[in-house]
A protein has these predicted regions:
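Extracellular/lumenal ectodomain signal focusing on beta-strand-rich modules
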Residues: 88, 165, 243-245
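Short beta-strand segments enriched for Tyr within beta-sheet-rich domains
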Residues: 109, 180, 190-198
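Active-site acidic-Proline motif in GNAT/NAT acetyltransferases
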Residues: 27, 187-188
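RNA pseudouridine synthases
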Residues: 1-163, 170-175, 255, 261-271
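Short amphipathic alpha-helical face segments that pack within enzyme cores
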Residues: 41-45, 193, 200
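Short histidine-centered loop motifs in beta-beta connectors
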Residues: 182-185
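Pseudouridine synthases involved in rRNA/tRNA modification
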Residues: 1-20, 26-30, 174-176, 197-272
């Protein structure tokens, strides 16, 4: 019998109303469902939070609960709730994810996102110090045809336009190595954009297994071969990228801002 899990382990809710549900996605959680278990993705957890319990094997039989009830304090439903992610984050990236509960909200928010009217602020811990201390990286991205990793992209002149602004918050040292805390402002939303652009200027995100300089770390991770020594060299448990804030202006001129702090391991390493 699996142990009952607490509701606070299900979702970290930043804001909720009848149309929107904004959450703080933890590092290590994928956004979309996988074939492993019903808690392994953000979408599955959002459905459970809204009352749909896929843990139930039959009437009065929930695999996580000895008495057959859903282990979270939710009003149960047999209908799979609508879950639409307006923005998505990589598995190891933590932070703000904006989701909608109905089709009209999905249409409105999706339009704002496509038009670039939802502004995103990230925080990253990188190796080294960027020069200049603030700037705009305007470099197109496309498939990395020389990589063994199918999902890996790179800066290439025939790629899709991508722009990332950054600003140095401060630099600091750990064990004789210099790191920097950056505020990062992506103007476009390409796959792995921030990680690629920061690596391209010589400041890879700390803990990045794919763009940190040796993609064998990523291959060993997905193939279950990542050793304790490799994890030690990566320094942090996940790559140090956090979606700090989403901001947009509503049709009637009101500014909406959703924000959350980085996880404790991130804050501790950066001295925040």
């Amino acid at each position: 019998m699996l142990s009952i899990r607490k509701e606070e382990e299900l979702l970290r809710v930043i804001y909720e109303d009848d149309a929107l549900l904004v959450v703080n996605k933890p590092a290590g959680l994928v956004c979309h469902p996988t074939k492993t278990d019903c808690l392994s993705s953000l979408v599955a957890r959002l459905r459970i939070y809204q009352g749909y319990c896929p843990l139930r094997m039959g009437p009065g039989d929930c695999i996580y609960s000895p008495d057959g009830s859903c282990p979270w304090n939710v009003e149960e439903t047999d209908t799979v709730p609508l879950v639409n992610l307006i923005n998505r984050l990589d598995r190891e990236t933590s932070g703000v994810v904006l989701t909608t509960k109905n089709y009209e909200a999905a249409r409105v928010m999706g339009k704002l996102m496509r038009e670039g009217k939802i502004k995103k602020t990230y925080q990253a811990i990188v190796k080294g110090v960027p020069e200049p201390a603030a700037g705009l990286i305007d470099q197109p991205l496309g498939d990395d045809e020389e990589s063994q990793v199918v999902v890996k992209d790179c800066v290439r002149p025939d790629g899709t336009p991508a722009r990332t602004a950054y600003r140095l918050v401060r630099s600091f040292e750990r064990d004789g190595v210099t790191y920097s805390l950056l505020d990062v402002f992506p103007d476009t939303g390409r796959k792995h954009q921030i990680r690629i652009h920061l690596a391209w200027i010589g400041c890879p995100v700390v803990g990045d297994k794919l763009y940190g300089g040796d993609e064998r770390y990523y291959l060993d991770l997905v193939e279950g071969r990542l050793t304790a020594e490799q994890r030690r060299r990566l320094i942090l448990p996940w790559h140090a990228l956090h979606a700090r804030c989403l901001t947009y202006t509503t049709w009637d001129g009101q500014t909406r801002r959703f924000e959350c702090e980085p996880e404790p391991w991130f804050r501790e390493f950066a001295g925040m």
